[in-house]
Amino acid sequence: MSTFLQSFKISQASDEYKQRRKTQMLKFFTASAITILTSRFAYRSTIARQYVPTLFQGNHSPPLSYNFTTDAAVAVATGTILCGSVSSMLVLGGFWILDVSNLGEFGWRMKEKLGGLEKEKHLGEMEMDEESRYIQDSLNDLLDGKYDFEEEGGNNSVA
């Protein structure tokens, strides 16, 4: 466990930090409530569509008034709503646990945890070979508008 988490006391936290955590908690609980409501809706719509035959009817064939298109549309819509609500609950719960407010901060935290900052510094300090430097300079000249296509004499092939 990091020293930050061991020495952290909520009484010493700033009001901005407390408000941020409260917002994260409310987002998670809202997503959880939506997940519960959509799962209840899915359960009830499934029970309502259930075919219950009468005493001497076969249970292997649906009634003639059955509409497969409507049933498929309701199933797809219900599944999509359930998938979206559960996914949002998982993402917002993970953000609350990791104390992350947006995707940019999540990317920065993951880069820090996986050692990306040190690797990026190491790559930045490495010497660039001549071909890479030529390509980089050519692209920079092209983006800056310094490259003149007519000077080449119509020869656009790469050497």
Swiss-Prot record:
The chain crosses the membrane at residues 25-43, 74-98. One of its GO terms (cellular component) is mitochondrion. Keywords: Membrane, Transmembrane, Transmembrane helix. Signal peptide: none annotated. It is a multi-pass membrane protein. InterPro entries: AIM11. It is found in: Membrane. Belongs to the AIM11 family. This is Altered inheritance of mitochondria protein 11. The lineage of its organism: Eukaryota, Fungi, Dikarya, Ascomycota, Saccharomycotina.
